[in-house]
Curated annotation (Swiss-Prot):
Pfam families: Cu2_monoox_C (PF03712), Cu2_monooxygen (PF01082), NHL (PF01436). PAM activity is inhibited by EDTA, phenylglyoxal and diethyl pyrocarbonate. PAL activity is stimulated by cadmium and inhibited by mercury. A protein binds at residues 533, 654, 706. Cu(2+) 2 binds at residues 242, 244, 314. It catalyses: a [peptide]-C-terminal glycine + 2 L-ascorbate + O2 = a [peptide]-C-terminal (2S)-2-hydroxyglycine + 2 monodehydro-L-ascorbate radical + H2O; a [peptide]-C-terminal (2S)-2-hydroxyglycine = a [peptide]-C-terminal amide + glyoxylate; N-dodecanoylglycine + 2 L-ascorbate + O2 = N-dodecanoyl-(2S)-hydroxyglycine + 2 monodehydro-L-ascorbate radical + H2O; N-dodecanoyl-(2S)-hydroxyglycine = dodecanamide + glyoxylate. Its cofactor is Zn(2+); Cu(2+). NHL repeats lie at residues 501-544, 570-611, 620-665, 673-717, 769-812. The chain crosses the membrane at residues 867-890. The modification Phosphothreonine is found at residues 946, 959. The lineage of its organism: Eukaryota, Metazoa, Chordata, Craniata, Vertebrata. This is Peptidylglycine alpha-amidating monooxygenase. CDD domains: NHL_PAL_like. It comes from Rattus norvegicus.
């Protein structure tokens, strides 16, 4: 009965709360404060049915709904703030955020943690400030931006003696047309908290310029920030950029041993949420953190300074990280530039704007006091408080004094009357921006030589319009560069002597002589699959001027066009594809073993089950009908299928110059690309996109842009252009590409008359783009190498459409690499290249030892190696037998020397071998013998020190956890 009474009382109290607060109005201890002016409320559907802000999840976890208490903005670009006290006094940890907002009504939201809000009202205009003491940004959400998720085991520390006591929510209402019905809005954030201590603590590292001056009319001004990191290791997982209207692009890097690794790069005019880094970046003692903001002073009549008003500018990069709990710091700052000369080598991407869709552009403004100022009016110098260079470690003081606790409180209005320039001017402008060579210079006067950029919003609109590319809100992946032009940068060093690919001269497959070989691929068993044209030939009579196939009367190819070949002896294991194709072209195989092929005569894409005779599983395009809409292709060239999502990408093709994406079921999703024009094609322009290669762990799709002689890579989810790889040695054509972890293989075409570049294969370090090897066949020669495929052991196959030949190439010296494993994901990379940051590997063999092991395995498993397994076994057994004889002789001599003539020689193999294993006290302990030698330990191989990464647990440490995270102690600071 007592329990029922308590339950009834609780329901009654909750009902009263719902009626009184109307919309999650949690009457915290702040309820005694004066309330914001408000009238009788009528609530939107979103506000109905809520019973309170605190929801228990289990004994230790609870959810906190932090929402606006039913507000109706009256003007566009209204910023409302509200606060909520942490419902517990003890220490807690924020482990997840869930936005509760509609894109139709809310432009963006920020959630701060502090000890005292700026206002005592239930909500207030944010121009009054956010907090009176300290403010730390915990979360940011923006329309069209990706969500921010905390990694498992990571949490923000709140409450207790040192954590924040209040949450302050800031909501920006952009376009208020959705409020024509005067409904109430309860947008906000649901915060998941736990009382369970987290092993990793999240924090914020703020990089901020405090002394940048932007001269009026200056075309390009760089604000550079750099600090040496001298703390315990931190691991970056998200970032956020912030400037006002003059900002073009903000980029952040970790610099280690002169190598620039991208943390994040974003357009500050995009919604300023936290964006996840493509791959976690670790920062350790001695690394340098560097950031650059690119501004323009065009349109200003006087110098622009760093400050808190809309007439001022800001250069902020927020880096969200986590650290091991016992070493964790909740905030760090950098406001200096300790290495200005270092920025001479900053990647060129740092000065190149990122295109955005017009509806994604951020609305900016700071402080209502600037709303009535004319944009061309004289700009006041910042106040003394704004100019003060504060202590580097005082993050909250920086926010309070420099930003006035009002960062991101915007009042700039979008001006629809701004006019664009002509299209021809724009084309030249974009081309110059992309092709300009001295983008990496930090000097503002040198940067002024760049092409004019104009208004940031208009430039991005134009780039979108001319490129026809899907814009992205996500940053480029962690890498050391974006793209270079021929002859620039460290692109073509001498090929490394440690890595060389040569033709396997005893492979008989070179004499198969099928028809024109158009495609090659490898199945799950590493069998070679060939797609060829039989007795059909693609020549000048095959198509008319409208790309309609003219030799339909020949009928389909009457022989099997798909051959499965044994990779060792080149025997045909299986064949199919009879009476189905006219002019085969591209071939790829998905993770389920299905074949994806294209036919340029049929203008179609086929999905085939190699073990079924029921016909194609899926057909895309219309037979013999070229076209450029969602249902037609025009001579499609290749297909790539994303392993995790099943997304289908088609390069289309000889006469469409686009990439088309379909769902796994064949439904059109999107397309991007356009025909290139002029001698300097822009990113996203193609002249025969001929071959595709997926880079799954980076979510990239690389395209062999054949007639432009280059390789372009794009994000598979956003279609953002990531990088271009182009070398003078490519010549005018790149026919085909293939990717294996860490490496990109390519083959070019025959040189034009007067050109010197030979037709050959290339091996490139995917991280840096540099060529590390070139190769050619010995038997026969390349004439039109049409497709290439590589296996993860470095075996390469190339098919030639003119010589009707397939070559097999292998590594003459095993590439030295390391195998890095984290959470079941293995990444192989060149030892000298820092491609993707991975945790430190322990109890792994060194790369040289691993190389020897792999070579032994290869010798014992490859029939074509010419080394007999019997011979190897004999060579291994003989030394063992000799050693056994020696030991037995020594034992016999020892027995005689001590007069033990009656002792029988131990003939038991168990006892003899036992002493070999070190189990007998007087025996020969080979384990101790080898353990005493340099480079060995009793625990096995010494750990490979994988620079800049976590440490993984020993295989036999007996713990149940998958990893053992141990942050190493920092090195002592230099005496100087």
């Amino acid at each position: 009965m007592a329990g029922r009474a308590r339950s009834g009382l609780l329901l009654l109290l909750l009902g009263l709360l719902a009626l009184q607060s109307s919309c999650l109005a949690f009457r915290s201890p702040l309820s005694v404060f004066k309330r914001f002016k408000e009238t009788t409320r009528s609530f939107s559907n979103e506000c109905l049915g809520t019973i309170g802000p605190v929801t228990p999840l289990d004994a230790s976890d609870f959810a906190l709904d932090i929402r606006m208490p039913g507000v109706t903005p009256k003007e566009s670009d209204t910023y409302f703030c509200m606060s909520m006290r942490l419902p517990v006094d003890e220490e807690a940890f924020v482990i997840d955020f869930k936005p509760r907002a509609s894109m139709d009504t809310v432009h963006h939201m920020l959630l701060f943690g502090c000890n005292m809000p700026s206002s005592t009202g239930s909500y207030w205009f944010c121009d009054e400030g956010t907090c009176t003491d300290k403010a730390n940004i915990l979360y940011a959400w923006a329309r069209n931006a990706p969500p921010t998720r905390l990694p498992k085991g990571v949490g923000f520390r709140v409450g207790g003696e040192t954590g924040s006591k209040y949450f302050v929510l800031q909501v920006h209402y952009g376009d208020i047309s959705a409020f024509r019905d005067n409904h109430k809005d309860c947008s906000g954030v649901s915060v998941h908290l736990t009382r369970v201590p987290q092993p990793l603590i999240a924090g914020m590292y703020l990089m901020m310029s405090v002394d940048t001056v932007i001269p009026p009319g200056e075309k390009v001004v760089n604000a550079d920030i750099s600090c040496q990191y001298k703390m315990y290791p931190m691991h970056v997982f998200a970032y956020r950029v912030h400037t006002h209207h003059l900002g073009k692009v903000v980029s952040g890097y970790r610099v280690r041993n002169g190598q620039w690794t991208l943390i994040g790069r974003q357009n500050p005019q995009l919604p300023q949420a936290f964006y996840p880094v493509e791959h976690p970046v670790d920062v350790t003692f001695g690394d340098i953190l560097a950031a650059r903001c690119v501004f323009t002073g065009e349109g200003r009549t006087e110098a622009t300074h760093i400050g808190g008003t809309s007439s001022d500018e800001m250069c902020n990069l927020y880096i969200m990280y986590y650290m091991e709990a016992k070493y964790a710091l909740s905030f760090m700052t950098c406001t200096k530039n300790v290495a200005p000369d270092m920025f001479r080598t900053i990647p060129a991407e740092a000065n190149i704007p990122i295109p955005v869709k017009p509806d994604m552009v951020m609305m900016h403004g700071h402080h209502k006091e600037a709303e009535n100022k004319e944009k061309s009016a004289l700009m006041q110098q910042p106040k003394q408080g704004e100019e003060e260079v504060l202590e580097q470690g005082d993050f909250y003081s920086l926010l309070s004094k420099l930003l006035g606790e009002r960062e991101d409180v915007h009042v700039h209005k979008y001006n629809p009357t701004e006019k664009t320039e002509s299209g021809s001017d724009l084309v030249a402008e974009i081309a110059n921006v992309v092709q300009k060579k001295d983008l990496g210079r930090s000097d503002a006067r040198e940067g002024a030589e760049h092409e004019e950029w104009g208004n940031a919003i208009l430039v991005r609109d134009r780039i979108h319009r001319f490129h026809q590319l899907e814009s992205t809100l996500r940053p480029a992946e962690s890498r050391a560069f974006s793209f270079q032009q021929p002859g620039e940068g460290p692109w073509e060093p001498e090929p490394s002597g440690d890595f060389h690919v040569e033709e396997e001269l005893d492979w008989p497959g070179v004499y198969l002589l099928p028809g024109q070989v158009s495609g090659v691929a490898l199945d799950s068993k590493n069998n070679l699959v060939i797609f060829h044209r039989g007795d059909h030939v693609w020549d000048g009579n095959s198509f008319d001027s409208k790309f309609v196939y003219q030799q339909r009367g020949l009928g389909p190819i009457e022989e099997d066009t798909i051959l499965v070949i044994d990779p060792n002896n080149a025997e045909i294991l299986q064949s199919s594809g009879k009476n189905l194709f006219y002019l085969p072209h591209g071939l790829s195989i998905d993770t389920d073993g299905n074949y994806w092929v294209t036919d340029v005569a049929l203008h179609q894409v086929f999905k085939l089950d190699p073990h079924s005779k029921e016909g194609p599983l899926l057909i895309l395009g219309r037979s013999m009908q070229p076209g450029s809409d969602q249902n037609h292709f025009c001579q499609p060239t290749d297909v790539a299928v994303e392993p995790s999502t099943g997304a289908v990408f088609v390069s289309d093709g000889y006469c469409n110059s686009r990439i088309v994406q379909f769902s796994p079921s064949g439904k059109f999703v999107t397309q991007w690309g356009e025909e290139s024009s002029g001698s300097s094609p822009r990113p996203g322009q193609f002249s025969v996109p001929h071959s595709l290669a997926l880079v799954p762990h980076l979510d990239q799709l690389c395209v062999a842009d054949r007639e432009n002689g280059r390789i372009q890579c794009f994000k598979t989810d956003t279609k953002e252009f990531v990088r271009e790889i182009k070398h003078a040695s490519f010549g005018r054509n790149v026919f085909a590409i293939s990717y294996i972890p860490g490496f990109l293989f390519a083959v070019n075409g025959k040189p034009y008359f007067g050109d010197q570049e030979p037709v050959q294969g290339f091996v490139m370090n995917f991280s840096s783009g540099e060529i590390i090897d070139v190769f050619k066949p010995v038997r026969k020669h390349f004439d039109m190498p049409h497709d290439i495929v590589a296996s993860e052991d470095g075996t390469v196959y190339i098919g030639d459409a003119h010589t009707n030949t397939v070559w097999k190439f292998t590594l003459t010296e095993k590439m030295e690499h390391r195998s890095v494993k984290k959470a079941g994901i293995e990444v192989q990379e060149i030892k000298e290249a820092e491609a993707v940051v991975e945790p430190k590997v322990e109890n792994k063999p060194t790369s040289s030892e691993l190389q020897k092991m792999q070579e032994k395995q290869k010798l014992s498993t490859e029939p074509g190696s010419g080394v007999s397994v019997v011979l190897i076994t004999t060579l291994l057994v003989i030394p063992v037998l000799v050693l056994l004889a020696i030991v037995m002789f020594i034992r016999w001599k020892k027995s005689r020397a001590f007069g033990d003539h009656d002792r029988k020689l131990e003939s038991s193999s168990g006892r003899v071998l036992g002493r070999f294993r070190g189990k007998g006290s007087g025996g020969l302990n080979l384990g101790n013998f080898f353990a005493s030698r340099k480079g060995y330990s009793r625990k096995g191989f010494d750990r490979v020190s994988t620079e800049g990464s976590d440490q993984e647990k020993d295989e036999d440490d007996g713990t149940e956890s998958e990893e053992e995270y141990s942050a190493p102690l920092p090195k002592p600071a230099p005496s100087s």
